[in-house]
A protein has these predicted regions:
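Glycine-rich, basic loop-to-helix element that forms the pyrophosphate-binding segment
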Residues: 74-91, 101
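Short aromatic/hydrophobic "clamp" motif used to bind/position activated sugar donors
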Residues: 96
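Short, acidic, metal-binding catalytic loop of nucleotide-sugar glycosyltransferases
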Residues: 35-44
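Conserved donor NDP-sugar-binding/catalytic core segment of glycosyltransferases
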Residues: 103-143
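Conserved catalytic-core segment of nucleotide-activated headgroup transferases in glycan assembly
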Residues: 294, 298-307, 320, 431-438, ...
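C-terminal, non-catalytic tails of nucleotide-sugar-dependent glycosyltransferases
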Residues: 1-14, 123-124, 133-134, 150-168, ...
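A conserved acidic beta->alpha catalytic loop
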Residues: 51-60, 76
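A recurrent flexible, glycine/aromatic-enriched loop bordering the glycosyltransferase active site
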Residues: 81, 89, 136-138, 142-151, ...
Length: 657
């Protein structure tokens, strides 16, 4: 804004979007809208103002306030559709944004909508509309069988994950609607049969749909909309009802496919059914928590599984249900941005399942404790769904191994009871599932024993080898990598204590200058106390790869645990040889390098460490084998092929292409 108080919005270069704003009085709101547009838009834009013969001094005040703008002046009111069409004709950018004069764009509003409009098959994009108090006004909209429009999330909490994932919607409100200019003009613009306002945006989106193009809601873009700020509520209601009749007559055949709403407020399942009506498949995935991608415990694998489901089946509705909401706000956004609905967790489990009765075609439950916890809910509310049990790791095996190491007495008896209960839960989950996902051939053999004929699919984690992994001479010292979430009973804390007490004293006799660096999340005071002259307790690091590519050997002699260990997958990808036990090596087809890496004897473990640390040729042989494993056995393509085959087995059509 210059010293005179005038606002210059002339684009500095070719505009990426032409913003079309129709005016009919109401200058005070329009001024706020234009000011917000100028303040919160970083990309060059063109502003096209269409004055529909405002009955007051709006046009004069606009001309006095803003410069660098294209103004279309009408002698009579052409209505919203007609005025918008004029603005589109006058615009020069490849992309149009129709913006109400009572719509206040928020910081970062434009890039997500431009991103969506550039995607194949997308015809239009709309933001999350907020009320002035910050609550949700409209998180996308659905239209029922008699043409009534229903805003998703009306007056809801904008922080709620239900309103924070992008998805296809029935239509997007022209309060802020982005569409390609050539496509808009090719369609003939807004139909002026809906003049002066209402339902022209619904009609446009239905015409896009008839061409095979979707309208996408993206909540990363946010716009505050002053509800009916450009007219009275009563006049708006009457216009809506009049134009609904026109809309229903035109689109009756498609509307017959839409659900009939009775009392939306009292029956949220109707809104849910309408929201997901066009989803070709509906998947419910249940796990302990929103995946902590910077931790182990199966979380990176679950994150990748969800990512691949969303990538391979973009037309599916994927709901991720977390049994615990721990750090959900921190870790949910990447899933939400992929179009995955995250529930972490509901405040009322029974109500949540009741509202989604018969909603899902496939339910995937990860881990035995979750299968046991949700078995009753799923049997009652989703009996029609095909069931997948994802072992992640057979927890009873970890407990069995822990029992063997326990001191005896009451604690051993407690562990034995817990082991028996977990074994029973996991066997039941295997037997009741239609198919089973597991992480290793070892787990497959157990499943075959307890459920002969059960169809299993091995889905280990995915890693991507580090390009040009550093060689022998570029590395030094030892690395211990593992999280300590379970505290004193953590497999990694037990392993570290065993390493320091039984293995490294033998190694350090010949290599006293070599340091052991310990990295991993949730380090306890008892682990911190293990620091010493040759042991550095680093703790949590944001970038483990930096450590994995500096160390010469990774060592973690696990004495109990189960499943495929993420820490060693990360070692594969970094080209870092690891030394471990038979428990630690479970699930890794190490082949002829196994004797160089695996032992359950502490003296032999020390000898393996010593040889790898000093023998360049052996180290390079092992590194080459591990990098080959990473690229051929734990690669994304192998994971996807197995996943597509598994989903086809339960009746989900393979993805197009």
């Amino acid at each position: 804004m210059d010293p005179s108080g005038r606002l210059n919005v002339a684009p500095a270069g070719e505009p990426v979007v032409s913003v079309v704003m129709v005016l009919f009085g109401g200058w005070d709101l329009a001024r706020r809208a234009i000011s917000a547009l100028a303040e919160n838009t970083e990309q060059p834009f063109e502003l096209v103002l269409v004055d529909n013969a405002s009955p007051d001094d709006t046009l004069a005040r606009a001309e006095a306030f803003v410069e660098g703008v294209t103004i279309v002046r009408n002698e009579a009111n052409r209505g919203f559709g007609g005025g918008s069409n004029q603005g589109a004709e006058a615009a020069r950018a490849r992309v149009l944004c129709f913006l109400n004069s009572d719509a206040l764009v928020q910081p970062g509003w434009l890039p997500p909508l431009l991103e969506r409009i550039g995607e194949s098959g997308v015809g239009a994009a709309v933001p999350l509309f907020l009320n002035e108090n910050g609550s949700v006004q409209e998180a996308g909209s659905v239209i029922d069988s008699i043409g009534h429009a229903h805003a998703v999330g009306s007056d809801g909490d904008a922080r709620d994950f239900r309103y924070r994932f992008p998805r296809e919607v029935d239509y997007g409100s022209a309060a802020c609607l982005v569409v390609r200019r050539d496509l808009f003009l090719e369609l003939g613009g807004f139909d002026e049969a809906f003049s002066p306002a209402y339902y022209e945006d619904s009609d446009l989106c239905f015409r896009l749909h008839a061409r095979g193009l979707t309208t996408i809601f993206d909540p990363r873009s946010r716009v505050v909309h002053v509800r009916h700020g450009s007219g009275s509520f009563e006049s708006a209601r009457k216009l809506m009802e009049k134009h609904r009749a026109v809309f229903v007559e035109r689109w009756n055949e498609r509307l017959l496919e839409r659900p009939r709403f009775v009392e939306v407020a009292q029956n949220p399942s109707q809104m849910l059914a309408a929201r997901d009506a066009d989803a070709l498949d509906r998947f419910l995935v249940i796990d302990d928590r929103v995946p902590h991608t910077d931790r182990g415990s199966g979380d990176p694998r679950m994150s990748r599984l969800l990512e691949e489901l969303a990538r391979l089946w973009p037309s599916a509705r994927i709901t991720f249900l977390a049994a615990d909401g721990e750090d959900a706000e921190r870790y949910a956004p990447p899933l939400l941005e992929r179009g995955i609905e995250v529930v972490a967790p509901p405040t009322d489990w029974v109500k949540w399942f009741e509202e989604r009765r018969f909603h899902y075609g496939v339910v995937l439950v990860s881990r035995g404790q979750n299968a046991a916890r949700f078995d009753g809910h799923l049997g009652l509310y989703q009996p029609q769904a095909l069931r997948i049990f994802d072992t992640e790791a057979l927890s009873f095996q970890r407990l069995e191994r822990q029992v063997e190491l326990s001191p005896g007495g009451r604690e051993r008896n407690r562990l034995r009871a817990e082991t028996a209960k977990m074994r029973e839960s996991e066997i039941r989950a295997v037997q009741e599932a239609d198919i089973v996902f597991c992480v290793s051939e070892e787990e497959t053999r157990f499943i075959t024993e307890v459920a002969p004929g059960k169809r299993t699919f091995v889905l280990p984690g995915i890693v991507e080898p580090v390009p040009d992994a550093p060689g022998f001479d570029e590395r030094r010292d030892l690395l211990f990598f593992g999280g300590f979430l379970a505290g004193a009973v953590s497999p990694n804390e037990d392993s570290l204590r065993y390493l320091l007490a039984e293995v490294l004293p033998h190694f350090w006799e010949d290599h006293p200058d070599v340091v052991l660096n310990v990295i991993g999340a949730d380090v306890s005071d008892s682990v911190r106390a293990l620091e010493g002259p040759q042991t550095r307790i680093v703790g949590y690091v944001e970038d483990p790869v930096a450590w994995l590519t500096r160390a010469r050997v990774h060592v973690n002699p696990m004495r109990f645990g189960a499943g495929l260990k993420q820490k060693f997958l990360d070692s594969l990808a970094a080209g870092l040889p690891f030394v471990t036990t038979t428990v630690g090596a479970e699930g890794f087809p190490l082949g002829d390098v196994r004797p160089s890496l695996v032992s359950d004897d502490p003296v032999e473990l020390a000898a393996l460490l010593s040889r790898l640390y000093t023998d360049r040729a052996e180290w390079e042989r092992v590194q080459a084998h591990l990098l080959e494993l990473a690229s051929t056995r734990f690669d994304a393509d192998s994971f996807r092929r197995t996943l597509v085959g598994a989903m086809a087995y339960v009746g989900v059509a393979p993805p197009a292409g």
